């Protein structure tokens, strides 16, 4: 069994050693829930990595969005280069679920675009969980959505071993049942080809490796791993395990049984609709379902097959669907990062999904069993989750209730940096005072972050600052992905000194050069000025030893009082620790994770073309397809050097697309 081996130039410092020991003690004493309260810059990810390495148990880390998940995945890959670090998020670049708007009698067909790179990584994640124990899967909250049954997925694997006998026709039939496609011309992921006594398989979990099976009669003589682009042999294998090309691979006998059960439900539903005199709904449901049944009978699949998942996975009505949690070993660990956001997301997903599907069922577009194709209910997630560590700088009520209000704190930063000084000033003439504070901060060579309440305020303030000849820019949801990253890069490099935004809590805004965070209209209670939001925003100034925060308010709200009091409490603890140990706070110049994506974008793309591609998923997909086609053409012409260059460009573009998704 492989053990986790953490590789880092740093050792746990500050509060980290104590926090690691406390969490591990809790895990060993069978505590089901623990709370790790880690402030900005305290090294939460490094602490998680050390806990995982010492416990040596398979781990799932849940994040509340793809960007944060990609950041954690990247950091874990660096710290655990010898272990299986996997990424599991929704594989849709674009997803429009089917829906019916009764008021206008409008039916919206399901439409989606699948990201092949993410699909590959999802397959790699489930394969690792089934094959080994030194696995860390970093996932978004989408891991609570239905996935194929792990029992069927594992049951249908094809195990290959050198020296054993495999009847050729049966092996090819097994590959087709795993939803691999025979393609003797275009050899891509999820395909196989036959050449003489050789069968080449391009596994679903690889992008740059394939397997060549060399037979003598029915005996498998060799298994070689090779580069599918150049044909170069990479390794000789004794064994290989071929997993399905889809997580929804199903044995034919299961499909046949499901068809019978669907027919029974259909007849019951049609009788009910007829009794309610719903003629249109009756005809619609019968026509749509009969078509799906015909497709299932002839091909083993149909469009929207997931709506019949209850029958295909052998579940009873109302039972939870199989999800990634069923792929986890019983002794797995779960970290819920930024739990104050992630937990409410988990709670909300089921209700939103059910409301949409209920309308489809009522109007004859789907059978009632389609309601069981859903994410986990919060109560089900509670039941399935293994020993859990919630991680946040601002724990939510659920986490505090689960842990009895007991938290393990990460307050002392390894760098010695203090929480910023908080100053409260009147909101009257706040812009005039802000200009004065900006001048003082910029004179020190530092940057300024300003948070407003609306997009218009952010844009108007930026325009005003630019009229005063300040190098400033604004950031909000209407700013496209690449432009956003370029603004952050310009801020880091000093091309601009001031960034104005609405919600400065998003990943990527930990700016070490930030000397001032100004919160305008801090006394306007609401989502953007709640205690949690204020603490998180104040944390933006905690990366610099000279960081300050000014809250412009005409009255002290409960949120301001609690946020400032908590910040001052932490600051005092940090000061006392530094004085006791003779530590001088030091600003750490850390690379912003999201900016590394800019370096991976094809250098041949000019700025305008890059913006067009990354702001339009369809055009980006078309460009990636064009590069793939050129790469394969170069390989078929034996121009392997050119093919390799194109493959590197393609890889950089796909990685950048993944990080910017």
Swiss-Prot record:
The alphabetical list of record keywords is: ATP-binding, Cytoplasm, DNA damage, DNA excision, DNA repair, Excision nuclease, Helicase, Hydrolase, Nucleotide-binding, SOS response
User: Pfam families, per this entry?
Assistant: Helicase_C (PF00271), ResIII (PF04851), UVR (PF02151), UvrB (PF12344), UvrB_inter (PF17757)
Where it sits in the cell: the answer is: Cytoplasm
Please tell me whether the keyword Hydrolase is annotated for this protein: yes
Domain of life per record: Bacteria
What SUPFAM superfamilies does its record include?
A: C-terminal UvrC-binding domain of UvrB, P-loop containing nucleoside triphosphate hydrolases
The UVR domain is annotated at 621-656
Question: Which InterPro entries would you find in this protein's record?
Answer: Helicase/UvrB_N, Helicase_ATP-bd, Helicase_C-like, P-loop_NTPase, UVR_dom, UVR_dom_sf, UvrB, UvrB_inter
List of residues binding ATP: 38-45
Q: Per its database record, what is this protein's job?
A: The UvrABC repair system catalyzes the recognition and processing of DNA lesions. A damage recognition complex composed of 2 UvrA and 2 UvrB subunits scans DNA for abnormalities. Upon binding of the UvrA(2)B(2) complex to a putative damaged site, the DNA wraps around one UvrB monomer. DNA wrap is dependent on ATP binding by UvrB and probably causes local melting of the DNA helix, facilitating insertion of UvrB beta-hairpin between the DNA strands. Then UvrB probes one DNA strand for the presence of a lesion.
User: What HAMAP family has UniProt attached to this entry?
Assistant: UvrB (MF_00204)
- Similarity section: Belongs to the UvrB family.
* Designated name of the protein: UvrABC system protein B
Q: Tell me what organism the protein belongs to.
A: Rickettsia canadensis (strain McKiel)
Q: Top-down, what is the taxonomic lineage of the species of origin?
A: Bacteria, Pseudomonadati, Pseudomonadota, Alphaproteobacteria, Rickettsiales
